[in-house]
Amino acid sequence: MKEIEKLKEEYPLLNKLIETEEVLWVNPNMEKYETAIKDSPLSEENVKDAKERLKRFASYIAKVFPETKETKGIIESPLLKIPSMKQALEKNYEQPILGELLLKCDSHLPISGSIKARGGIYEVLKHAEQLALQHGMLTEEDDYSILDSDTCREFFAKYSIAVGSTGNLGLSIGIMSAKLGFNVTVHMSADAKQWKKDLLRSKGVNVIEYEADYSKAVEEGRRQADADPSCYFVDDENSHDLFLGYAVAASRLQKQLEELEIIVDEEHPLFVYLPCGVGGGPGGVAFGLKLLYKDNVHCFFAEPTHSPCMLIGLMTGLHDKIAVQDIGIDNVTDADGLAVGRPSGFVGKTMEPFLSGDYTVSDEELYRLLKELADTENIYLEPSALAGMIGPVRVCKEDAYLQKQQLMEKVQKGTHIVWGTGGSMVPEDVMNGYYKTGEALTILEK
């Protein structure tokens, strides 16, 4: 790896990142959609295939998870206008947010209460389908609800699934795998919250805890799975299936925007702010949105100041060859879902030509935003899910991106969507603790 001093000279923004300051990075490598898609390893066909698979499984999902009955087994979340929060942001940051502000509540996705219910559940279902088809338990024409049987559960019990996680991915993989009948092991890093471990164990999931961070948990999970031919490892750092499961969100969002009569075109740009850990969730969603809205959607990743792995990987072009620890950042943050020191090389390289930018936000800011959203809209998210909330303020305030893309006039007719990635499953006492922290920090700031 290039000497750190050389990197600092080449990329002056690194100095601020090393000081854990909040920064906004505009991606100089973003290309026009038509150019970017030509070199992409994934296509619209891949996303369509994932969408169809989720449809095939809908009857099974509706049967085993009654909370999805209303949506006929489609796992989807609300898209809400948050005008009171918008006013509060404008007042607190003394910055008008140009355009409308909405919250995509993946925090309230059924089954596992986070964005990971998209990719994680999809990858487990795809694996289950492949096994069932190979062994004649199922044909693609069948009603997939037949998988809810003792025979099928006994069949899946011969196989195991493993994953490394800081929390939410473990929840979605664990809950789904256990429901189908798989033996499932979740390798959890030191920053994983206790309640997430407890919940998984209550569902019959084997949880292995590590003193080290996320990358170590993934590495160990991968190593153990490699030694067992009947074990399938969900590889959060490299998985195309996870990525495609997330990408399906875009066409669902398109339908919701149409229902709200919100136009997205050249004169009405869409800005989307996505909390980013290793990169799969935000990368997949952003990729799906680019397929639909091309150059009229502008996607930004949001990371904690203590774990800006994707920003560093993208900015230096080193991707997964550099970790935040290499430049002296500790990767310690209360935003547990984003506490990742080394980004996914696959996601970084795939998203590099599509991504508008990436910014960092401090833990203190996340807690203040958590309290503000609860006070103004009565919506409770976990700290990491608030990383997107400051995005519209940043992009409007530091308007380098808007200037560069000639959006200064258009942004007022545009729409900002903050992706709320998790929170509905947080136990009440834990959420109260988060709120109190936000309250204390708000008083301190004033």
UniProtKB/Swiss-Prot annotation:
Q: A Pfam family in this protein?
A: PALP
Co-factor(s): pyridoxal 5'-phosphate
Lineage: superkingdom: Bacteria
Q: Specify whether Kinase is a keyword of the entry.
A: no
The protein's GO terms of the molecular function aspect are:
D-serine ammonia-lyase activity; hydro-lyase activity; pyridoxal phosphate binding
Alphabetical list of InterPro entries matching this protein: D_Ser_am_lyase, Ser/Thr_Dehydratase, Ser/Thr_deHydtase_PyrdxlP-BS, TrpB-like_PALP, TrpB-like_PALP_sf
By its UniProt entry, which SUPFAM superfamilies does this protein fall under? Answer: Tryptophan synthase beta subunit-like PLP-dependent enzymes
State its Enzyme Commission number(s): 4.3.1.18
The catalytic activity, as recorded, is:
D-serine = pyruvate + NH4(+)
Q: Which PANTHER family match?
A: D-SERINE DEHYDRATASE, THREONINE DEHYDRATASE, MITOCHONDRIAL-RELATED
Alphabetically ordered keywords of this record: Lyase, Pyridoxal phosphate
NCBIfam families the record matches: D_Ser_am_lyase (TIGR02035), PRK02991.1 (NF002823)
Question: What GO biological process term is on the record, naming one?
Answer: isoleucine biosynthetic process
Q: List the protein's name.
A: Probable D-serine dehydratase
The family classification in the record reads:
Belongs to the serine/threonine dehydratase family. DsdA subfamily.
Q: From the UniProt annotation, give the residues forming the signal peptide.
A: none
Query: At which residues is N6-(pyridoxal phosphate)lysine found?
Result: 116
